[in-house]
Amino acid sequence: MESLKSKKLFAEAKKVIPGGVNSPVRACLSVGCDPLFIERAEGSYIYDADGQKYLDFVNSWGPMIMGHAHPDIIKAIQDAAVYGTSYGAPTSSEVDLASMVVEAVPSIEKVRFVSSGTEATMSAVRLARGYTGKNVIVKFDGCYHGHADSFLVKAGSGVLTLGIPGSPGVPEDIVKNTISIPYNSVEALETTLRDADLNIACVIVEPVAGNMGCVPPAPGFLQKLREITAEEGIVLIFDEVITGFRLSYGGAQQYYGVTPDLTCLGKIIGGGLPVGAYGGKADIMNSVAPDGPVYQAGTLSGNPLAMAAGKAALKLLQQDGFYEDLNQKSAAYADGLLEVAGRVGLPMQLNRVGSVMTSFFTATPVTDFETAMKADTGLYGRHYRQMLDSGIYLAPSQFECSFMSSTHSDADLKRALLETEKSFSLLKNA
């Protein structure tokens, strides 16, 4: 399918928006085509500017776990908007949503809302530094925690997709306080975190890496990370912007049984509206202004529309069997993808945790940044374009995840597997 209106809109956008997009990976540079411009979405489908329909496995990069335009969420937003879109003052809805988050997430005793995942991670790191009086942060190769200066070191997501080693504009004085070590390496944990001379304030980690593709934690990795950070007095931060309320109602920390000191959230907790949050132990969170000296603020923090959408979303997730059904559906689809790849004879590794997955075009198991980089990005680009022509919308990067929603039907998944087999056969025989 060709979207002529999308091509025209992209040309117009490039005149007034850098690269024609407001987030780099959307430009589709790594998959060799122009981006679709989306006009509307409903359930498991999105519709482009020409009105063409696509089965969506991106789901706004994760937030749409109940599918697009869920009527309960839309109604909550509409009902809230009648009373005004922003007050810059406290509201009852932010107290309600905060209470729901505290009840759900094991590590969170107090929570502060912000307007994006980047704000959440940036604020959590500042808080950890202020609380400990130390400066150095440790992250993991290929993990992405937003575009704050401290995180643009061996980062994932669009930084990895576009092959950018770092970013101009980030001073060396900032980067020198960030240490990046291999994900899933217990040896690196021991060597780095036990070194008292490094002055480490915190470790920030995606408990399931989701920005070099889906890379699950090796058995015992998160447990060892928790053990060492606790022994060394280092604040452990889980970046659950992707995994929060996605893997389970209590996030990855509930799923794996590992409780960090601080947690960053986003995506699902806003029901699809711009939102972020960071929270954790009360004694740490009490260091945030106005209770404490660590400053953080935001004009639109706790926006009433986002709070209303978030409350509606979390209520839906509380339905009996929601996660069991979603994860069973995801497992069946993943098994189908592996079966198709095996039947066609195309080398592929599929990593999945719950309803998050990535198909890597490589014969090598993907367990970290180094092995993720062995994936054939050119092959993925061809697969992406072939699937798009068939009306299937995948992430426009080998190093991003596919997300399942509760609205993906058996018929949807059967069709997706059929089109995948056609695409894989073309790739194999090319």
Swiss-Prot record:
It is found in: Cytoplasm. GO terms for molecular function: glutamate-1-semialdehyde 2,1-aminomutase activity; pyridoxal phosphate binding; transaminase activity. The modification N6-(pyridoxal phosphate)lysine is found at residue 267. HAMAP family: HemL_aminotrans_3. It is an enzyme of class 5 (isomerase). The lineage of its organism: Bacteria, Pseudomonadati, Thermodesulfobacteriota, Desulfobulbia, Desulfobulbales. GO terms for cellular component: cytoplasm. It comes from the Bacteria. Belongs to the class-III pyridoxal-phosphate-dependent aminotransferase family. HemL subfamily. One of its GO terms (biological process) is protoporphyrinogen IX biosynthetic process. Its cofactor is pyridoxal 5'-phosphate. It catalyses: (S)-4-amino-5-oxopentanoate = 5-aminolevulinate. Its EC number is 5.4.3.8. This is Glutamate-1-semialdehyde 2,1-aminomutase. Pathway: Porphyrin-containing compound metabolism; protoporphyrin-IX biosynthesis; 5-aminolevulinate from L-glutamyl-tRNA(Glu): step 2/2. It comes from Desulfotalea psychrophila (strain LSv54 / DSM 12343).
